[in-house]
Amino acid sequence: MGAGGRMQVSPSPKKSETDTLKRVPCETPPFTVGELKKAIPPHCFKRSIPRSFSYLIWDIIVASCFYYVATTYFPLLPHPLSYVAWPLYWACQGVVLTGVWVIAHECGHHAFSDYQWLDDTVGLIFHSFLLVPYFSWKYSHRRHHSNTGSLERDEVFVPKKKSDIKWYGKYLNNPLGRTVMLTVQFTLGWPLYWAFNVSGRPYPEGFACHFHPNAPIYNDRERLQIYVSDAGILAVCYGLYRYAAAQGVASMVCLYGVPLLIVNAFLVLITYLQHTHPSLPHYDSSEWDWLRGALATVDRDYGILNKVFHNITDTHVAHHLFSTMPHYHAMEVTKAIKPILGDYYQFDGTPWVKAMWREAKECIYVEPDRQGEKKGVFWYNNKL
């Protein structure tokens, strides 16, 4: 959901599944970032404080309305209706708060305003409210953007090589195993990433915990701000403790806890599907460069949720190319650069539930083509 006007861009022509799964080119593109930037109207790079706040305030108003309805009217409902009302609240509040998360994420990219202090203040407040350590995310996520598609240096959703698949992997390569893995991924994946860097790149030099200021993820200039992030999380946890003490644990779980689980599940789903697709290459150090890595991502279609999520879902390619660009210009930018990107642009309109299952089935590990000339280019495979 958003406030303010936004140009409407006609959706990409519908592709057949064969076209959707066709590999994107892995050769050095015949265009440069500078040429892409020249094709974009200059106003698309301008950040507006009133406009940025309008989207945030709108999301807060909607979330507050849901909270008011749940606390005021749900206690009056007979039990059969309350069993329907609460799941509706959880789903609606979860997706709206995901939109709030997206705006806070934009602050970490310095795409909210022209003032870094304002971006950091807004991002710290709203990421902390959603139990995300703002500066920890800001710095590790920045490294993800700097190293997207690199098997050695990317920060998250780094695919395994076939040789790294555990012995029990083949026993999970079935419908039941995939169901279990997806359930764990969408319920525990987000906190496990923060606490233990699960799905992140390995750090042999030390324990990679996003809450630990001395973790090898960060450099010396960043460590003090990790303490600030941790303080923000502790402050929110204390507030939740006081709320639970006053209103009851059940109230806190129903009004905040379950919607937060929905937020976490959508964040894992969105990022997983943005970077996992049978058509996308990954590169080792012999082939990787920033532009090809940034193009190793895919735009998806979540229907009406595209707007609720501030188009982070269907403009992700443009976001990786120009991460300081405000989200409310991303549709226009995508339209401007698609003719230049050509086959390097990947859009998949497969319904997200179907795509989630397909990717879990098809994208188990990466390996180079046996007959391919480029041994440093890796593609997804599922044959164990």
From Swiss-Prot:
Keywords: Endoplasmic reticulum, Fatty acid biosynthesis, Fatty acid metabolism, Lipid biosynthesis, Lipid metabolism, Membrane, Oxidoreductase, Transmembrane, Transmembrane helix. A motif (Histidine box-3) lies at residues 316-320. Its main location: endoplasmic reticulum. GO terms for cellular component: endoplasmic reticulum membrane. The chain crosses the membrane at residues 56-76, 84-104, 117-137, 180-200, 226-246, 253-273. CDD domains: Delta12-FADS-like. Pathway: Lipid metabolism; polyunsaturated fatty acid biosynthesis. A motif (Histidine box-2) lies at residues 141-145. It is found in: Endoplasmic reticulum membrane. It is a multi-pass membrane protein. Its EC number is 1.14.19.-. Pfam families: FA_desaturase (PF00487). Residues 1-23 are annotated as: Disordered. It comes from the Eukaryota. Residues 14-23 have a biased composition (Basic and acidic residues). GO terms for biological process: unsaturated fatty acid biosynthetic process. A motif (Histidine box-1) lies at residues 105-109. GO terms for molecular function: oxidoreductase activity. ER (microsomal) omega-6 fatty acid desaturase introduces the second double bond in the biosynthesis of 18:3 fatty acids, important constituents of plant membranes. It is thought to use cytochrome b5 as an electron donor and to act on fatty acids esterified to phosphatidylcholine and, possibly, other phospholipids. The histidine box domains may contain the active site and/or be involved in metal ion binding. Belongs to the fatty acid desaturase type 1 family. This is Omega-6 fatty acid desaturase, endoplasmic reticulum. It comes from Brassica juncea (Indian mustard). The lineage of its organism: Eukaryota, Viridiplantae, Streptophyta, Embryophyta, Tracheophyta.
